Curated annotation (Swiss-Prot):
InterPro entries: NADH_UbQ_OxRdtase_su1/FPO (IPR001694), NADH_UbQ_OxRdtase_su1_CS (IPR018086). It catalyses: a quinone + NADH + 5 H(+)(in) = a quinol + NAD(+) + 4 H(+)(out). NDH-1 is composed of 14 different subunits. Subunits NuoA, H, J, K, L, M, N constitute the membrane sector of the complex. It is a multi-pass membrane protein. The keyword Manganese does not apply. The chain crosses the membrane at residues 15-35, 88-108, 117-137, 159-179, 191-211, 250-270, 273-293, 313-333. GO terms for cellular component: plasma membrane. It comes from Geobacillus sp. (strain WCH70). It comes from the Bacteria. This is NADH-quinone oxidoreductase subunit H. Signal peptide: none annotated. Keywords: Cell membrane, Membrane, NAD, Quinone, Translocase, Transmembrane, Transmembrane helix, Ubiquinone. Its main location: membrane.
Length: 333
């Protein structure tokens, strides 16, 4: 879509097009974050036998997250005296920017994608890891022992689970023969990869939850151990940036899971009269629901359990999946 607009427009309007589409993407993502948080709180409330937000914005609490955002914007912006001020200020931006950048290459339908590059999957993996730099910088700059411990946990966790996540998607790349996300979706026109690569899907999904720092892998911000972890000294809109990056990554990871394993916008058999955008939204919503379900259901792992799961279980299983996939490809295709 982006290329068509740019090719049909005079060169002086390219900047305006980029800016306008960037704003549209930003507002779409912020709308998801706003009501994604509300949906998460309502689902968690339902699973725990509570009502959830039900006061601000009517019976369903539709304006609860809006009120929370306004509260954060009006809060005092404090910086600890002992903090490294420039790095303390930059860290939330460093954490948030990559989360927003990865969305540009995700195809939501066959006609709606901001940037179709040949190595979209590689781009996503490379850029998504940059957020950890902001997390580590924020923990270090805070000059707080709890923040530093949380930052070190985040770095160790990213290294431990980025590798199984990358290795797990290599099976998909072997089957498709491409790193282009559109090609990966088109290759699933007849059969989704969740049925062909179930082991890869399980490894990818577990590693994705760890990458998102969500329960049961939320050690970097474990409230019962580290108060709030790496962002313990942050408040107001700077804290909101860290929160936004987490939920934007939730959006991106759910979309990537849909693209890699659930056929993207391709419909279920005999239901192809339903638009592709509806199918993508439905699959995406199911993935988000499962991520919320994980948060409510599982207890937090210990640090040693988290490391062992990543290096002793997920990584070997992902390697085995590559070997089996390559062997089958060589013998039968």
């Amino acid at each position: 879509m982006m290329e068509q607009l740019l090719n049909s427009a005079p060169s002086w309007t390219n900047l305006v097009i980029f800016f306008g589409l960037g704003l549209a993407l930003l507002f779409a993502v912020l709308a998801f974050v706003t009501y994604g948080i509300l949906a998460e709180r309502k689902v968690m409330g339902f699973m725990q036998g509570r009502y959830g937000p039900n006061q601000v914005g009517g019976r369903w609490g539709l304006l609860q997250t809006v009120a929370d955002v306004l509260k954060l914007l009006l809060k005092e912006d404090t910086i600890p005296k002992a903090a490294d001020k420039p790095l303390f200020i930059l860290a939330p931006i460093i954490a948030f920017a990559p989360a927003f950048m990865v969305l540009a290459t995700l195809p939501f339908t066959d006609a709606f994608q901001f940037a179709d590059i040949g190595v979209g999957l590689l781009y996503y993996i490379a850029v998504s890891g940059l957020t950890t730099i902001g997390v580590v910088a924020g923990g270090w700059a805070s000059n707080n022992k709890y923040a530093l411990i949380g930052a070190m946990r985040a770095a160790a966790q990213m290294i431990s689970y980025e590798i199984p996540l990358v290795v797990s998607v290599l099976g998909v790349v072997l089957l498709t023969g491409s790193l282009n996300l559109n090609d990966i979706v088109e290759a699933q026109k007849d059969v989704w990869y969740i049925f062909i690569q179930p082991i890869a899907f399980i490894v990818f999904f577990i590693a994705a939850v760890a990458e998102l720092n969500r329960t049961p892998f939320d050690l970097p911000e474990a409230e019962s151990e580290l108060v709030a972890g790496f962002h313990v000294e942050y408040s107001g809109f700077r804290w909101a940036f860290f929160m936004l990056s987490e939920y934007v990554y939730l959006f991106a990871m759910a979309a990537l899971t849909t693209i890699l394993f659930l056929g993207g916008w391709h419909p279920v058999m005999f239901l192809d009269f339903i638009p592709g955008a509806v199918w993508f939204a439905l699959k995406f919503s199911i993935v988000v629901f499962v991520l919320i379900w994980f948060r409510v259901t599982f207890p937090r792992l210990r640090a040693d359990q988290l490391m062992e799961l990543g290096w002793k279980v997920l990584f070997p299983v992902a390697l085995l999946n590559i070997f089996v996939t390559a062997l089958i490809q060589e013998l039968f295709f």
